[in-house]
Structure formats: structure tokens, C-alpha cells
């Protein structure tokens, strides 16, 4: 994004609309700090500039990665899906991605107003990668990895920024305590925030094994969830859904 200095009247109406505070007054002009801007297009789509001075620019790699992770209308070329992640567990009764005894994790790194660099995204991915997890192959962050066994990202995008990015992986129930431990440790080494979602299949007696495990290892959690109600076709005959 850029602001056309010849059209801009310095009315400052656009400044509050940037979630990353990237629109700033500098040398008696209103400019976009390109280091802070995540190319989300919010300033443009807000349509608050009276002279249409806010302009969208053509993005080249690796800067283009900012837009697909931050703009609500951009889509990933590989998956043709907009957004930062996949359907996760929400379509499990159709996809069968998550099986009995497995736990899916969704690490939502960064937030609008805070943002994240892909360096911090990689730090978290590398930390959980050491445990031996299976990164979701259709996840946009996974598609940026050069080594999916470790979680290492491409070197040329590590200093790029985004509102947020979601790391998705699954592992066995037995490795959940180790995942919790490494996430607590890596949280001290990054310069952003992240939230953790986790999911498992429901047992035949209606219990949720993951919640019982969290209680045993004293992990604070909110049990509000997204439940498959069985309206989709059953992909895994004999598996709990």
C-alpha cells in the first residue's frame, strides 16, 4: 500500500483505520510505514480518503505473503482458499483427518493490532517439530515450510509480517504434555501473542479424552468447542466421530 503525496490533503482520517498503526505522520506528510504494513487493504476498503490518495501496489514475493495472510479477500494460490488456516476439525465427520487417539492443535500466532513476523511463527513450529508432530499438509504455513519434519520455513520470508498465521498439526494423545511444555517455553522467546486450540474425537461413552488429560496435567482450558453432529458422510467406519 502507498499514499499518493500529490493527492493526500493530510486530513488524517485514514490513520485510525490501520490495525497495525502503519499509517503515520512523517515530515509533514501522511505515509505508510512499509515495515509495519501487512497489506491487509483495510485502509483502502474503509473508503475514508476524500481524495482517493490510498493506492494498492503490485506485490512481489516475498512481500505478497503479507496480503494472503492478512487480507480477508486474498486467497492462497496453492489451496485457492482465503484465510489463514483450513477447516480444522470442523469438517471431521466428512474428512476423517482426526482419528481416535489423535489430537489436533491449532496455534493462532499474532492478532490484528499486534501482528507477527514469520520468524516468530517459525520459532513455534520448530519447537513443536522437535517433538515429532505431523503438520497439516493443506495449511498455508505448512506450504511455506522447506522441511515439514522440523517446521523450518523458507529463509526469504522470515522477516515478513502478517496480522496472524495459524500453525496446524496433529499428534498422539501421549505427546500432549510435551506439546504443552514446549509451547509454554517458546512463549517466552517470541515477540507476539498466540492462542492454542486443541481437538480430539469424542469417545463412545460421550466423554472427551483430551479434556480429562488437561485436567490431570493441570492445563487451564475453556471447554467451548466446535462439534461435528454427524450430518456429513462417515469417512471412517467404526471410528468415533
Could you describe each region identified by the protein language model?
Residues 2-3, 9, 13-34, 38-62:
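Iron-sulfur cluster-binding cysteine motifs and their immediate structural context
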Residues 9, 66-101, 125-129, 159, ...:
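Long, contiguous binding/interaction regions
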Residues 152-160:
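Cofactor- and metal-binding active-site motifs of prokaryotic enzymes
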Residues 29, 134-136, 194-195:
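Structural motif
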Residues 109-111, 169-173:
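Short beta-strand-to-loop capping motifs
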